[in-house]
């Protein structure tokens, strides 16, 4: 699939009441205009904006927002930048499936754990997995094992980008992905759309749309959106997981970890200051006898979090949480709808990276905004 480097058109919206200018992003291909309205809006209230083609002066031009999003493609990853900071990296080659890591919170540390760290090393970053533990014959693109009992596993293969676009409000990529089973046979064709944007430096968002064109696998075919929370959060001893259902994590009932929720949030401290630069040769590996393992400092530093929102239009909403997961991981399972067991079907999720815990960051309200957004009327 040929890649399109789509240039976003910058326009401005002038708010009727305050006269302030707000930057907007117009996509000529879809005919859609996107902008972030500053401040908060109470339910039932309204605001008026007038579309203008140019700002009066340069100072007026950048009133809001001041964080355009830039996507930069490398050979194996996409760097997502705002305010000259790479705050998210989408690794689309080199693993069994694409994933985000690092994903920086406002404190400057990643709110998700990287690859090969600690227990369950296949719990990597943030991304979509598939198949679970191969129940009823579904392919396993989850455990990352080559051998039994959880292998051999399949892969999600990057086939190309249909679109990579940067802009004053958001950046977006559209990707073709094919899933193959352990024997290299294609089983799923997917078109993945990821939109990246900031409301403020303390509120960062990733919007996902997974369009499953066809699914030719056996079994229940679970699509698993997963977030492995940062080790520094020290969940559940220090950090915490909260959710719309009010379900305790970890559960007070041994073995009972499944629940349904429209949103789930994990938050905790981002750790102490970074370790000093190494003084030994890089060949001194931490797994050699007598080597000193770098100290990992928990319950220190500013508190950040990450929330996952389910969308009411998804089949089975609110979807099941906790399958194939430990307390330190958020996993939400989506299944093909009965009327399209082999596709096509689509499901959507939003990720909210924030300062503070779920209550301080208004996670429940942001989830409600995602489920029932503002209505926009355009008048000539």
Predicted segment positions?
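Alpha-mannosidase-like glycoside hydrolase catalytic domains involved in N-glycan trimming
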Residues: 1-66, 90-169, 173-176
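Short, hydrophobic/aromatic-enriched beta-strand segments in well-ordered soluble domains
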Residues: 45-57, 84, 175-177, 192, ...
């Amino acid at each position: 699939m040929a890649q399109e480097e789509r240039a976003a058109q910058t326009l401005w919206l002038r708010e009727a009441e305050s006269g302030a200018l707000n930057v907007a992003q117009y996509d000529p291909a879809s005919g859609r205009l996107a902008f972030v309205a500053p401040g908060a809006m109470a339910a039932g209230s309204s605001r008026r904006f007038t579309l203008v083609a140019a700002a009066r002066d340069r100072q007026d031009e950048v009133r809001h927002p001041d964080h355009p999003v830039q996507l930069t493609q490398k050979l194996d990853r996409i760097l997502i930048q705002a305010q000259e900071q790479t705050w998210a990296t989408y690794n689309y080659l080199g693993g069994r499936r694409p994933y985000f890591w690092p994903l920086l919170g406002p404190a400057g540390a990643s709110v998700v754990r990287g690859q090969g760290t600690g227990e369950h090393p296949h719990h990597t970053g943030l991304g979509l997995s598939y198949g679970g533990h191969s129940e009823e014959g579904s392919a396993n693109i989850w455990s990352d094992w080559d051998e039994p009992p959880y292998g051999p596993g399949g892969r999600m293969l990057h086939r190309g980008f249909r679109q990579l676009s940067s802009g004053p409000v958001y950046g977006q990529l559209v990707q073709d992905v094919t899933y193959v089973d352990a024997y290299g046979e294609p089983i799923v064709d997917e078109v993945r759309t990821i939109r990246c944007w900031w409301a403020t430096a303390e509120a960062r968002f990733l919007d996902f749309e997974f369009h499953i064109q066809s699914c030719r696998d056996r079994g229940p075919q679970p699509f698993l959106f997963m977030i492995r929370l940062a080790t520094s959060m020290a969940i559940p001893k220090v950090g915490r997981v909260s959710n719309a259902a009010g379900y305790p994590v970890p559960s007070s009932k041994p073995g009972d970890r499944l629940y349904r929720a429209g949103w789930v949030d994990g938050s905790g401290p981002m750790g102490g200051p970074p370790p000093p630069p190494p003084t030994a040769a890089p060949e001194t590996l931490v797994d050699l006898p007598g080597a000193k393992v770098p100290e990992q400092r928990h319950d220190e530093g500013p508190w950040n979090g990450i929330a996952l929102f389910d969308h009411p239009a998804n089949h089975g909403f609110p979807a099941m949480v906790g399958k194939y997961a430990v307390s330190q991981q958020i996993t939400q399972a989506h299944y093909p709808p009965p009327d399209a067991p082999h596709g096509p079907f689509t499901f959507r999720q939003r990720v909210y990276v924030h300062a503070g815990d779920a209550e301080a960051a208004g996670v429940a309200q942001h989830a409600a905004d995602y489920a029932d957004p503002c209505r926009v009327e355009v008048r000539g």
